[in-house]
Amino acid sequence: AEQTNKTIAVAVTDLETGQEININPDEAFHPASTIKVHVMLEVFHQAEQGLFALEDCLPIANSFTSIADGSKFSLEQSEDAEQTLYPRMGEEESIAELTRLMIVRSSNLATNILLEKVGAKHVQDFIHSLGIPGVRLVRGVEDAAAFRRGMNNSATARGLTQTMELIAEKKVVSEQASEKMIEILLGQEFKESIPALLPKSVKVAHKTGWTGDVYHDTGIVYPDGRRPYALSIMTRGFSEAQPDEAHARMAEISKFIYDKLQ
């Protein structure tokens, strides 16, 4: 096989024992869609503060403001894993449903609509207040003007795992909000990585991310009869043309961790 430089980072925290397993945990990656978890955190945070209710509706629109220069931009529908919102321009959808679509189908459109509502800076401030290291959200999806200026999101496996750990321990916003977030993450439709080789009875609340040669999966794994563990796998350097290779490698790592912790 051709030698490409592949970087893999893994961070595990076992909530049963407190044990950690870390490989390159502080390596910075383009987070791709894993950062949508942090948008969800701030949505629940602002709902808790009474700034809006999750049942409130927002207009579905495909026009967004660049954080770099205030210019307008739109998302490429063909690049979005979630297609059902695009034919509905001008209609409204609830914040709750937009949040669900952002997570379970990785809707870029829902992400940017929600980010315009809550504000990227507020998401970053909340990440900071939770003490989550190595995670930076500065812009929404496909903000080309910001990208050209080097204004990019970033994350580490340690940061993603700490995020999942806080959600699993129901310490984010409130116990009820954390439970709702877990429920959303359990509905994840992209299951090629962390859950792929685990026993069917094992629930996984997780969020995948993919862009270019970057493939990630971060989540909470619930083995039978014990407390869960938080796991993040981040990769760079797998072929864009062969996503199956990245997914297979991540699935193997997930299975290895699962077996090791049993």
Regions found by a protein language model. Give the residues of each.
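Active-site SXXK
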Residues: 18, 30-63, 102, 231
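Mid-domain, small-residue-enriched loop/turn segments at the edges of structured enzyme/sensor domains
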Residues: 7, 91-95, 99, 105-164, ...
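Sec/Tat-exported extracytoplasmic proteins
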Residues: 1-4, 41-51, 62-64, 68, ...
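Acidic helix-start/capping segments at beta-turn-to-alpha-helix junctions
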Residues: 15, 54-78, 117-119
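Structured C-terminal helix/loop/strand segments within mature extracytoplasmic catalytic/sensor domains
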Residues: 117-119, 162-192, 202, 208-262
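Beta-lactamase-like hydrolase cores
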Residues: 1-27
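Conserved catalytic neighborhood of penicillin-recognizing serine enzymes
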Residues: 65-112
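Solvent-exposed, acidic/flexible segments
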Residues: 28-37, 51, 88-96, 103-108, ...
